[in-house]
């Protein structure tokens, strides 16, 4: 969940960029013995985004995502057509899995689900949960911006906090939200193809629409305690480096195998 929201928070800024915008965020775990936070660096300009975290690089431009593997000097291109094909393939695989599980004796099915852990439980679960997004009235600060805290609860238990900045408090807020809607539509079309397992992604987009702003802090909770946090540490006008939104010379495209 945190990873998904970190990416969404980054993309929400991607149009605030006629002069270029630089963002930096720090992600940390409250549970693990973490020496230092994981840093994400993001550059934005004219609806384009470059996001770096270690050796991982993602570029978003012209309604297309590029994931870049710097050690291997390869990249993968993901456009709407690719998302559609991937969604269809995953949906077929899920339907086959459901059919296989339905034909298993209860004891064998329980054993398989236990072996697969929580992921399999999410795939086979059918019960709806009561999800609520509530404005708390509390405020915090991140990267010099005052934000308002919203709580996300599931069946009355807090799962997440998002501290949100109104679009108007940031450069080109209307363009920011328009880019978010366009990218969100691309992913919503993908998850809508899934017979099961797409609820989490749909809920993430729904939560962000409900708060109607840009998260600069997100915290995940388990059993009432925070376990992970992503916090913006820098938001400033800055021209991106030359070639920031280009595929590096000499990199080889890897096709997704469908």
Label every model-predicted segment.
Residues 1-4:
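Positively charged n-region of N-terminal signal peptides that target proteins for export
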Residues 14-16:
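N-terminal signal peptide c-region/cleavage motif recognized by signal peptidases
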Residues 19-258:
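Extended soluble regions of mature proteins
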């Amino acid at each position: 969940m945190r990873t998904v929201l970190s990416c969404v928070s980054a993309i929400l800024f991607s149009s605030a960029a006629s002069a270029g915008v630089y963002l930096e965020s720090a992600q940390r775990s409250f549970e693990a013995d973490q020496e230092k936070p994981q840093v994400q660096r993001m550059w934005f300009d004219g609806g384009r985004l470059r996001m770096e975290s270690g050796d991982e690089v993602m570029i978003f431009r012209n309604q297309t995502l590029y994931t870049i593997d710097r050690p291997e000097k390869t990249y993968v291109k993901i456009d709407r057509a690719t998302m559609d094909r991937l969604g269809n393939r995953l949906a077929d695989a899920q339907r086959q899995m459901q059919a296989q599980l339905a034909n298993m004796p209860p004891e064998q099915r329980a054993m398989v689900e236990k072996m697969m852990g929580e992921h399999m439980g999410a795939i086979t679960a059918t019960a709806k949960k009561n999800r609520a997004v509530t404005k708390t009235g509390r405020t915090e600060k991140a990267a010099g911006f005052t934000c308002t805290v919203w709580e996300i609860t599931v069946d009355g238990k807090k799962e997440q906090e998002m501290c949100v900045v109104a679009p108007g408090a940031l450069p080109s807020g209307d363009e920011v939200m328009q880019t978010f809607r366009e990218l969100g539509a691309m992913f919503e079309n993908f998850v809508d193809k899934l017979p099961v397992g797409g609820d989490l992604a749909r809920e993430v987009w729904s939560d962000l629409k409900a708060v109607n702003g840009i998260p600069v802090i997100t915290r995940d909770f388990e059993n009432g305690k925070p376990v992970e946090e992503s916090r913006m540490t820098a938001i400033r006008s800055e021209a991106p480096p030359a070639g920031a939104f280009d595929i590096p010379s000499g990199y080889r495209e890897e096709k997704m195998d469908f």
